[in-house]
Structures are given as C-alpha cells and as structure tokens.
Amino acid sequence: MLSKLLRLGEGRMVKRLKKVADYVGTLSDDVEKLTDAELRAKTDEFKRRLADQKNPETLDDLLPEAFAVAREAAWRVLDQRPFDVQVMGAAALHLGNVAEMKTGEGKTLTCVLPAYLNALAGNGVHIVTVNDYLAKRDSEWMGRVHRFLGLQVGVILATMTPDERRVAYNADITYGTNNEFGFDYLRDNMAHSLDDLVQRGHHYAIVDEVDSILIDEARTPLIISGPADGASNWYTEFARLAPLMEKDVHYEVDLRKRTVGVHEKGVEFVEDQLGIDNLYEAANSPLVSYLNNALKAKELFSRDKDYIVRDGEVLIVDEFTGRVLIGRRYNEGMHQAIEAKEHVEIKAENQTLATITLQNYFRLYDKLAGMTGTAQTEAAELHEIYKLGVVSIPTNMPMIREDQSDLIYKTEEAKYIAVVDDVAERYAKGQPVLIGTTSVERSEYLSRQFTKRRIPHNVLNAKYHEQEATIIAVAGRRGGVTVATNMAGRGTDIVLGGNVDFLTDQRLRERGLDPVETPEEYEAAWHSELPIVKEEASKEAKEVIEAGGLYVLGTERHESRRIDNQLRGRSGRQGDPGESRFYLSLGDELMRRFNGAALETLLTRLNLPDDVPIEAKMVTRAIKSAQTQVEQQNFEVRKNVLKYDEVMNQQRKVIYAERRRILEGENLKDQALDMVRDVITAYVDGATGEGYAEDWDLDALWTALKTLYPVGITADSLTRKDHEFERDDLTREELLEALLKDAERAYAAREAELEEIAGEGAMRQLERNVLLNVIDRKWREHLYEMDYLKEGIGLRAMAQRDPLVEYQREGYDMFMAMLDGMKEESVGFLFNVTVEAVPAPPVAPAAEPAELAEFAAAAAAAAQQRSAVDGGARERAPSALRAKGVASESPALTYSGPAEDGSAQVQRNGGGAHKTPAGVPAGASRRERREAARRQGRGAKPPKSVKKR
C-alpha cells in the first residue's frame, strides 16, 4: 500500500523532468558552436556566477546550461551523447532522488551531468560504486569528460595510502566504493592529528546500484577492529564435536530464521565429550557460544556458496553479487568457527575500535541520490529510511524482451539436464546465453556439464571475479556461453556483438596507452580506433539479433525479486531482442524454505515423470509469496538494525564531535580545567552527600583525591580551629572552593614543571594526547559493552519489557557513566603521567602509553577505596565519575590440550571443583543442577569476536 501511495506523484515528476530535458535540448545548438576552449571556459563562468555576491545563482538556476555543456563534452570526448531520458535521469539525481533506469540505459553516462553540476559548488561530489574495478574504470572513463571541462577527478582504492586518499578527496569529483568511503570516515575519527584526516565533508553522493548498497548491504555494519584475546583451541574442539552430533536428535535447525537450537540430548552429549558436569554453569557458559557457532558453521554456512577457501583462508562470498568480500570477516566468533570447520589457520578474534552502519553513514550527506535498474520493489524502504523518492525513467527504446514462464522440475538433476539441453540448442544456432546461478558450487557443476558436452563457455564467480569485465564485455558475442553467479551490480553491459568501449579500451591498453598516464595519446588513438571496432561489432550484432538476441537462463530463484529482475534485465537492452526463463526444482533453497511441501504434493498427484516440467499459476504465486515473505523479513531485520544503531549513532555523534574539537583546539587548557572542576565536584558530592559535617569521612575523600592529583592542603587545615574540631562550621561550598583552588594551583605547578622538562607548550601537547587516548580507549570499551548489552537484551521481552526501550535506557546510563569516566581518567593522567624530553614515535590510534595503563590500574584500585566515601551510595547510583563496566562473574577458562581420548579439558584459573547451585541437594542429577543454574541466571560474559578490517 505504501509503495502505491509513493507512486501517486510519479507521473507529475516524470513530466517535470521531461520539461527539463526539453529545455536542455533547446540549448544544444548554441553549445555545439563553442570551441573546445570556449566549452571548457564555461566551467569558470559557472563558478563565478555561483560566487557572485550581488546576484548569486543557485545550482538549480545553472542546471539547464551546465547539463547542455556536459552533454556536449561527452559527445566530443566519448562519442556518446546522452539521450533525453538520460538527461531526465540526471535531473532526478540532482534533485536527490533514486533514478530507476533499466539495464543498458546508460546510468554511468547519466551520472556525469549531475556530478559536473554539483562539483561547481566546490564542496566535492562522491560517486559510490560497488567495487574497486568500477570505481577505477568510471573515474578514468567518465573522468575524461570532467577533465576536459577543467575539473579534477580522484578515485579511492583499497591499496591507497592516506596521502593518496587525501589528494583524491580534495578533487572536485571522487569515485570509490561504499566500504572505502565508510572506513575513511571511521579512520578520520580515530586520527590523532588534523594532518591525518583525509575526507573534507559529506555534501553530495550519487550511489550506483543504490539498492545493492543501501538495501542489501545495510544489514552489515562497517567495523574497524583490533586484536583481542581469544581461545582458538575451543573452536577446534567444537569443530570436532559438531560432525558427531545428529540433526533433529541433538539439535534443530530453522532455515527460515537461520538459527540452531540445542536439545537436551545435545547438551548431555557435549557435557560427556568435554567431561564437564554442567554446560550452563557460570564457569562453562562461554562454551555455549562455541557450540552454537560450530553447529551454525555445519548447517547454515556452505562452502562455495556462502564462502570459499583460497590459499588457506576463508573468504566470504556476497550472497547478492557473488563477489568475494576481501577483508570482511563474520563477527561473534562465526568466522573462526568456519575456519576450524575447514581446518585452516584460525585467526585471532578481534575487538571493535570503530563502527557505523551504511544506513547511518549515508545519512551524513547533505544530499543523497542513487541509480539502479530495480528500485520500485524497495521504494517504501528507501523512503522510510533515507527519505529518497524513486522515479522510474522511461526507456529510450521500447522493451521487446520475451520473459517466458518458469519451468519447475521435481528434482535438481532433472532440472540441470534440461538446462544443459536448452543451452546446447541455443549454442548450436549461435545465440549468446547467460546462465545465472546462486552459488559457486552450482556454477562449477554446470561448467563441468558443458565441458562434457563440448560447449565452449566462460565462468564468472567469486573464484574468477578478476576477469569479470573481460568476460561480461564479450558475453554478447555470437555463440557466447557465460555461467555467472548473481549479476547484481556487475556494472558492465552485455552488448550484442561485444562492448565497443571496452574492446576499444582493451586494444589501446595493449598498445601501452592509458587515459590517466598518457591522456593526449590515448584520446588521439581512441578516435581513430573506435570506428574500426564499431564496424566489427555492428556486423556481429546483426548475426546475434537474427539468432534471437541474448538468452538469459536462471537456474534458481533468488530470495529477492530485485536480483531476479537484474538478471533478466541483462537481456533486451536498448530495444534489442532477447529472451529469459527460469528453471526451478523442488530442491531449490527458496522452494524448501517456503511452500515446498504443497508443490511436491501437487506434482505427486499429477504423477509426472521427473523430466517433465510443469507451468502453473499456483507455482508462480507460491514463488512470489515466498520472495515477498523473505523481503519483508529482511526489511524488518534492517529496520531493527537501524533502531538499535540509532542509539549508538547519537552517542557516536557526541564522541566524534568531541574528538574533532580536541583535534582542532589550539589551547585545551580551559577544557582540561573544566574536567578537573567536574571531577573534584563529583568527589566532594559523593563524600558530603546530604549528611551533616560531622558525618563526613574526609580522610576517605583525601585518600581518593590523592590518586588524582597532589593535594596541597590537609583536611585538618579546614576542620581544625585552634587545634579543636569545628566541623559544624565547615560547609560543603567552603570545602569545594578550597579544593578547587588547590587543584588549580597544582595544575599551574604541573604546567610549569613540564615546561621546564620539555619546553614551552609541553602541557598543551600532553592535554591533546591524553584527551585523545582516553576518549579512544573509553569509547572502545563502551562499544564492547554495548555489543554485550545488545546480545542479551532480547531476553527482557520475557519480563514483558520492550527490549529496544531497555537498550536505549541502559545504553544511555552506560554512556553517561563512560563520559564521567573519561573526565576522571583524563584528570588523573594529566597530573600523574611521566613526561620525558625525548623524541617519541607517532602514537597509533588504538595505542595507550604505558604510564596511562599503570595509572589506570592505580585508579581502579582507588575506586574501591572511594566506594566507602559515601557508605556504598556510589554502587547504587552511577552518577559519580567512574566507568561503569560489565564484569564477568566467573573465573577465566583456559585450554590445557586434548586428553588421551582427544577431548578438551576445562581448567579454571584459580578455580576448583564445580559448585552445586544453592538450594539443590548434593546428590541431585546433572539435569537438576543445570536447571537450577539456569533459574538462578548464573551466566558469564562470552568471548567477543568482531569483523576484521
């Protein structure tokens, strides 16, 4: 319903865009008369008109002229003139919409116009692609147009240094992947100097394949992590146990929810294997996460589908695009469990240093736009989360592709036999075929079948993605057979007869020419070589059209309709003929997860042979229903991720804003002194409370204060008069005033001391280093504790409480406690850290000086003393300035190596025998003791693992 409501004004928007395109067209004659130099000079003219103080123009005012200039430049440089529908798409992008343009309609060229227009403002434009190859290709290819018009173009690649990134971001237009933009944002907020920053703001972004990045990728947060302690031997031990456990006997699996649940027999089996009495006892509870991960690795993560193993390393495969996600790792120990399952090196677990979801990263931009061939199915989500409207841009030529109905077979074997027969028939008549699969395993199986039938073919999957552009560029040639995993975001059009631009570029590169390194020679050779390639490709394209155009064959329905539509959309581009069909079986994952039993019953009643397919509306409805259910589930997951991350997002904004103030502040003395006052005020409040002066324990207060700074006054000097106690005369305000003056005196003395040791400005440098180190360390600890809070917050629903509300409330309390802890530790470090006048290496973002660590230990010890100052009130109210942590209640577990029978032995550091829960007889059974432990809620904090970057 919401999608329909959102489309009500679409017709008016399309008419508005059509008027813009028509007006741009009326300017073409005047622009065509300009020389190259005059056309290039238009850029400076536009910039002057924007900056005019008396009569400034807006980007909207310049749109028609700027679009006309960019359109003419594209024609002169690329021999490609954007069609009117592309100008309409460009206008939609400038207005901050998602332009839905079918495959082959020229989204890459469309992007040139709004990028040029918005770059005139001088704030930078980010063009976001799905991989490094497309970012580099588009920056070179479309960058030729921008450079012709006098703009600078940069590209962000994974291998670049910070200096190279900074140069790229300072360009007028910057290409890069969503991951690189996001990680650079996180790294900038871990920098210890303004000189280390690379980005310069978030003003305007155009996201290519916007549905893939903003929808599919939204469930996966970007995480920068560092090493953490972990017990890799437990992963190995549970990888040994998992194959010994039987499904539906020891555990159950829910494929729809992608969860596993351990039965009572499974728990007893594990306890017997490990030689422990109670798996759910506090000391053993970390083992539960190892068990769950091992079972998930066994049942829910398949090799050559969800991941591949290359050179002894487990690499994740993107379920939507089929690409390898280099540098990505599953979190919560899942990646280590898979490594143990595959018997490869188990890499250390990691701790989160910085994180953000793509949803919240892209909401940083002042203006956001996107392009894709399939957006209407996700229009409601794009509007709800990103406030983006979706505009369907008409095709330049009518679509004449024939989409055949699905064929459903009883078995996978029968389905693949039919697929190979169909492809062989098409190959024989010279028709190019694109076969879409959902996994690496399936693509390689089909490849073997084609080899047996002696059908030449190319395979494009996660193992061969480096050859992606070459394979796709020739996939439309006569007799071409291409087996590929999911085609989402491939970026290179399948052109009948071959991709002319790609083939021309390939020939020029073979001659040693490069559009960036040798631009003049490249441009000259391009214009001479292009007509030759065009003629060759045109002749072959006619033969392909006579054979029926590109035939797209899907071997399985994806859980997302968009992915199916994107696969189909590879055929029938620009009015070309084409055909598509999906071959399905009851063994397909989607069919098994939803309504598979009903379909199997239908086929059984029809009594059809395995090799005879059916075509029925019931099947089509069942598939659509299944896909809709999955899409709705995924939408709910993404909304839930966003709701919880919104809590962290507000906290992240506060911390990052504070870091930036520290980085930019030339003199942090006032801020440091404010912290000193806040900390001492909190200490005094905790010591005085609401009682009378004679009830105050000033000795405990002084003991606590001495852990922070060298106190120069004594309690006696305030409370004694003529050697007699006069506590009734001392007020809380007098006590606080005296201590604040003393602290300011001590701070001035500390500054003089440092200047004598290290010269002028030493205290200012120490302030910056201390504040940055403390804020980074406390934020890192806070991320860990917030993750831990979120892991168990769902259990609050059992107490009739809203988990999200509880997460918001407790997260706020923890955040405020962290801010108080930052102040307290910063003050202690400023007064106590040792400073020497020797050159020091740059401080790494996650590093912490040894002196700070030593003081942190001392401060922790002093915290216990301070808790007695107010008779334990600090334990009840977290308003005092100290960090609030979530500590494990159980001894640490270590791995002592396997016993003679190969089982793992549990040792407890400093622990003894298992303790029987209170209220349980000594002779109680294992099950009774375990249930008692569960009821008492005795649980320990499980080991934490995060994604690695």
Swiss-Prot record:
It comes from the Bacteria. It is a peripheral membrane protein. One of its GO terms (molecular function) is protein-exporting ATPase activity. Pfam families: P-loop_SecA (PF21090), SecA_DEAD (PF07517), SecA_PP_bind (PF01043), SecA_SW (PF07516). GO terms for cellular component: cell envelope Sec protein transport complex; cytosol; extracellular region; peptidoglycan-based cell wall; plasma membrane. Gene3D superfamilies: Helical scaffold and wing domains of SecA, P-loop containing nucleotide triphosphate hydrolases, SecA, preprotein cross-linking domain. It is found in: Cell membrane; Cytoplasm. Disulfide bonds: none annotated. ATP binds at Q86, G104, E105, G106, K107, T108, D493. One of its GO terms (biological process) is protein import. Residues 925-934 have a biased composition (Basic and acidic residues). Its EC number is 7.4.2.8. The keyword Cell membrane applies. It is an enzyme of class 7 (translocase). Residues 869-949 are annotated as: Disordered. Keywords: ATP-binding, Cell membrane, Cytoplasm, Membrane, Nucleotide-binding, Protein transport, Translocase, Translocation, Transport. InterPro entries: Helicase_ATP-bd, Helicase_C-like, P-loop_NTPase, SecA, SecA_CS, SecA_DEAD, SecA_motor_DEAD, SecA_preprotein_X-link_dom. It catalyses: ATP + H2O + cellular proteinSide 1 = ADP + phosphate + cellular proteinSide 2. Part of the essential Sec protein translocation apparatus which comprises SecA, SecYEG and auxiliary proteins SecDF. Other proteins may also be involved. Monomer and homodimer. Belongs to the SecA family. Part of the Sec protein translocase complex. Interacts with the SecYEG preprotein conducting channel. Has a central role in coupling the hydrolysis of ATP to the transfer of proteins into and across the cell membrane, serving as an ATP-driven molecular motor driving the stepwise translocation of polypeptide chains across the membrane. This is Protein translocase subunit SecA 1. It comes from Mycobacterium tuberculosis (strain ATCC 25618 / H37Rv).
